[in-house]
Amino acid sequence: MVKLRLKRCGRKQRAVYRIVAIDVRSRREGKDLRKVGFYDPIKNQTYLNVPAILYFLEKGAQPTGTVQDILKKAEVFKELRPNQS
C-alpha cells in the first residue's frame, strides 16, 4: 500500500518537508516512489504537484493526517471528486 507522507529535510531547528509517495512499510527517510510536493512550516510555503497527487490518490494512496490537512487547505480534494462521479 502506498501513502502520501512527509519526509523531513533541512537542518537542525530549520526543518522543511518533502511530500512523497512511499510504500507503507518504508521508514520515514526510506526510498520514496516519487516526490509530489514540498512544505515549509516556518515560511508557511507549500508547493504541490497536483497531477501527480491526484494520480496516486486515484490509485488508492492514503494521505497521512498532516498531508491530508495540507491537501484540504490547497483544495486538492475538490479536483478529485468530479473525476470520480
UniProtKB/Swiss-Prot annotation:
Q: Does the keyword rRNA-binding apply?
A: no
GO molecular function: any one? structural constituent of ribosome
Q: Which Gene3D superfamilies match?
A: 3.30.1320.10
Matching entries from Pfam families are given as:
Ribosomal_S16 (PF00886)
Q: Where in the cell is it found?
A: Plastid, Chloroplast
Going by the UniProt record, its keywords in alphabetical order are: Chloroplast, Plastid, Ribonucleoprotein, Ribosomal protein
Please give the InterPro entries that the UniProt record associates with this protein: Ribosomal_bS16, Ribosomal_bS16_CS, Ribosomal_bS16_dom_sf
Disulfide cysteine pairs (residue numbers): none
Name a single GO cellular component. Answer: ribosome
Q: PROSITE patterns given for it?
A: RIBOSOMAL_S16
Question: What's one GO BP annotation on this UniProt entry?
Answer: translation
| Superkingdom classification of source | Eukaryota
- The question of whether Repeat is a record keyword is answered with no
What family is reported? Belongs to the bacterial ribosomal protein bS16 family.
Under PANTHER family, the record lists: 30S RIBOSOMAL PROTEIN S16 (PTHR12919), SMALL RIBOSOMAL SUBUNIT PROTEIN BS16M (PTHR12919:SF20)
Quote the HAMAP family the UniProt record gives: Ribosomal_bS16
What is the official name of this protein in its record? Small ribosomal subunit protein bS16c
Tell me the classification of the organism that encodes this protein.
Eukaryota, Viridiplantae, Streptophyta, Embryophyta, Tracheophyta
Which gene specifies this protein's sequence?
A: rps16
